[in-house]
Amino acid sequence: MTTPESFALLMARTDVVNLFKNLKFVIIDELHTFFDSKRGHLLSLNVARLRSIKPFQVIGLSATLKNTNLAKKYISNNKNTKLVSTHSKVAPEITILNSGNRIPWSGHSPRYALSEIYSEILKFKSSILFVNTRAQAEILFESLWAMNNKNKKIAIHHGSLEKELRKKVEKEIVEGHVECVVATSSLDLGLDWGNIDLVMQIGAPKGVARLVQRIGRANHTINTPSRAILVPTNCFEYVECIAAKECVELNFLEDEIYSEGSLDVLAQHIAVSYTHLTLPTKA
């Protein structure tokens, strides 16, 4: 298990041929996230180079993929690339929080619904509250902690925290020591927890695929519906939440964005690929 960056370093080793001599499969998780990023371009280059060293099968995984032709093109230009798809028979249970207070016309704070948010997380053993920015995560975490008269075990998780602290929070969620975590996109991908009972999206999700991905954190099992509550922070976001909810119910996803390979990534790849070779001094 590795990342595109660490994989690139492995490909630069002098023993790369021996290192991957028994390789049979390469599995790319969350495939859709690599189509429009330099990390994706780097990964594609190294997979292609590794293929020239040792043939193997590439498997791409995604829960929110719409453009299957793009996925096939990214994995391989081979016409024999096959698509295997499945759809959950259990639809997610999505609601929009009904607060007794008026939704603000503007702003991005859920302060008007704090008591309702706290009441919801008290109903469930474990929950994740997704927000869209790190500042929102800090403010919401502090607000919930200040009103936490039931001593709910609440934590925070975002990319600006030290790696060791993030890993500790993730471990404590799995072990059941943390009952609620306020998080940004740092918990969107790559973590399979079957013990999360509720997901709350604070603010508009800013994308149907992102909402589906976040909803999937709850009850990460096949035959159990995921529970999600959307909490708009202003009137316009209320409309966005309605639209996002309807799109999920209709199985509608946005098209993935694809960008051509970056020349700076190509230059880096060429340089790293030849670092272990002795090059002639005369051109």
Features from the language model and the residues they span:
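Conserved small/polar residues in nucleotide/adenosyl-binding loops
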Residues: T275-A283
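Helicase motor core with emphasis on the C-terminal RecA-like subdomain
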Residues: M1-P4, A12-V272
